[in-house]
UniProtKB/Swiss-Prot annotation:
Its EC number is 1.14.15.24. A motif (Histidine box-4) lies at residues 278-282. It comes from Haematococcus lacustris (Green alga). Pfam families: FA_hydroxylase. The lineage of its organism: Eukaryota, Viridiplantae, Chlorophyta, core chlorophytes, Chlorophyceae. This is Beta-carotene 3-hydroxylase, chloroplastic. The keyword Iron-sulfur does not apply.
Length: 322
């Protein structure tokens, strides 16, 4: 899952040994190579460095420290570094085997989490979509005028507010994300779970989906029973908020944070821009911007240097490493 601290000076995680380790020329050369190969290739290259004869103990330690990239913050990775400090080749081999198991377990756990969230997302999407379609049909069937004439004024009001509700939610999300979710202590109490590593398929921040769904339910219920243009407009606004929430879940949770697979849509140019724009939000590099979701790239265009960085990160984006 792509989570980064709120405060940070870079959009990408730091790659390098701890500051107290001296960076020798050999270690620096090795680290530069690591940035251009996959995690699996990193591990193979580093394992060769560790077991290669005539390599100084310090280089072995640096190599083992770099292995923490593959399984950060795990007991196995910490044990690997401790084994390197002992300078024992056998201990290093054992630690590498432990790291292999840690990587396999981590991948299996992530797969289970993705399947759990995907099942919940599919069930919610099908259920909400079915209810919305059926409720729309019932509303206009109930309020048709005598003789069966279609109330075109109400239909137009509903369609306009569907679009308006969705666009309005993007503006509201930009405001709420900054003022409520980050700057408000109560909002941050839930939202901070989204900016820290997650250990399960769900996080406290997911409660905002329910909270933001309440206005949509109220508007749809009120507009469903009110037989005039105002009722049609309220019904449409509720549908627009619902549509925005479903799209937000697909793009934010699925595409950006990889909580479930999204298929080939991830390769679309604008979807890549949405991804790296939200990545910059998690980095905190531009004061937390962008705060919006679907217009995040446009929000960054007003910040000096941000638009150029978005284009650079789009070119560097590699889904196989995420």
């Amino acid at each position: 899952t792509f989570h980064k601290p709120v405060s940070g000076a870079s959009a990408l995680p730091h790659i390098g040994p701890p500051p107290h380790l001296h960076r020798s020329f050999a270690a620096t050369t090795m680290l530069s190579k690591l940035q251009s190969i996959s995690v699996k290739a990193r591990r193979v290259e580093l394992a060769r460095d560790i077991t290669r004869p005539k390599v100084c103990l310090h280089a072995q330690r640096c190599s083992l420290v770099r292995l923490r990239v593959a399984a950060p913050q795990t007991e196995e990775a910490l044990g690997t570094v401790q084994a390197a400090g002992a300078g024992d080749e056998h201990s290093a081999d054992v630690a590498l085997q432990q790291l292999d198991r840690a990587i396999a377990e981590r991948r299996a756990r992530r797969k289970r989490e993705q399947l759990s969230y995907q099942a919940a997302a599919i069930a919610a999407s099908i259920g909400v979509s079915g209810i919305a379609i059926f409720a729309t049909y019932l509303r206009f069937a109930m309020h048709m005028t005598v003789g069966g004439a279609v109330p075109w004024g109400e239909v137009a009001g509903t369609l306009l507010l569907v679009v308006g509700g969705a666009l309005g939610m993007e503006m509201y999300a930009r405001y709420a994300h900054k003022a409520i979710w980050h700057e408000s202590p109560l909002g941050w109490l839930l939202h901070k779970s989204h900016h820290t590593p997650r250990t399960g398929p769900f996080e406290a921040n997911d409660l905002f989906a329910i909270i933001n769904g309440l206005p949509a339910m109220l508007l749809c219920t009120f507009g469903f029973w009110l037989p005039n243009v105002l009722g049609a407009a309220c019904f449409g606004a509720g549908l627009g908020i619902t549509l925005y929430g479903m799209a937000y879940m697909f793009v934010h949770d699925g595409l950006v944070h990889r909580r479930f697979p999204t298929g080939p849509i991830a390769g679309l140019p604008y979807m890549k821009r949405l991804t790296v724009a939200h990545q910059l939000h998690h980095s905190g590099k531009y004061g937390g911007a962008p705060w919006g979701m679907f217009l995040g790239p446009q929000e960054l265009q007003h910040i000096p240097g941000a638009a150029e960085e978005v284009e650079r990160l789009v070119l560097e984006l590699d889904w196989s490493k995420r």
